Amino acid sequence: MARFLSPLRRGTTYTRLLHLWVPMLVVSLWMFIDPRRPWVPALLVIPVGLIAGVRTGEGVQARWMLTPGKEAPGFSIAPSGSWRDRLRTAVWLEARLLLGVAAMFMCVWMPSLVYDLVRLSLGYPSDLAAWHPSPHWSYALLTPLPLLALYGAVVGLGHLVTAAARTLLGPSAAERLAALEERTERLLERTRIARELHDSIGHALTVAVVQA
């Protein structure tokens, strides 16, 4: 049970949920403009993803909200350097939007369903069900099910969006090569410093022995 509930004690569970909710601000604004075409935001994010600097912003958000506190989260914060990176960013925005819609649906309707089940168990009519079920106390036994579904959805969608971000916002081949070259240069520099230090110590010891 403790392992099952452990995600509730992790800050990443809530920051990932917040990350999923951020694009819903755009969707909510659009629904006020034209609720008959809710699919328009999915089209608008495609050209946005082709802008080079968008990849930097998405990478920073992923680092701060999907894997906060980790030194090597695996997300690139460099602007898109090729059309492949731009396309990956556009696909990422679509995936983030889709997962955000799923998270919003679960976060809105599962608590509403719990409220409706409680009303039915107390003898009040349903506000949500289309078939108008008769009130009965036994509906109280069903109230944990939507909460468990919400819990599983929040945790599962958080892991899913993190995995998608690592795939679509991860370093490109050119960035990995540049990082490898940088690490190689640092190792060579450390080796050179160690060699010079060794030679200096050896020279000092030789001088000390000769003087003795």
PLM regions with names:
Residues 81-85, 132-133, 184-185:
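Helix-boundary and loop/linker segments of multi-pass membrane transporters
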Residues 184-212:
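Histidine-centered phosphotransfer motif of kinases
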Residues 28, 96-120, 196-202, 206-207:
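Alpha-helical transmembrane segments and their membrane-interface junctions
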Residues 1-102, 152, 158-161, 165-168:
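N-terminal signal-anchor/first transmembrane helix of integral membrane proteins
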Residues 63-67, 116-127, 162-173:
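Perimembrane helix-loop junctions in membrane proteins
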Residues 157-192:
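Conserved signal-transmission helix
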Residues 28-44, 112-142:
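Membrane interfacial helix motifs at helix-loop boundaries and amphipathic/re-entrant anchors
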Residues 144-149:
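Hydrophobic alpha-helical transmembrane segments of multi-pass membrane proteins
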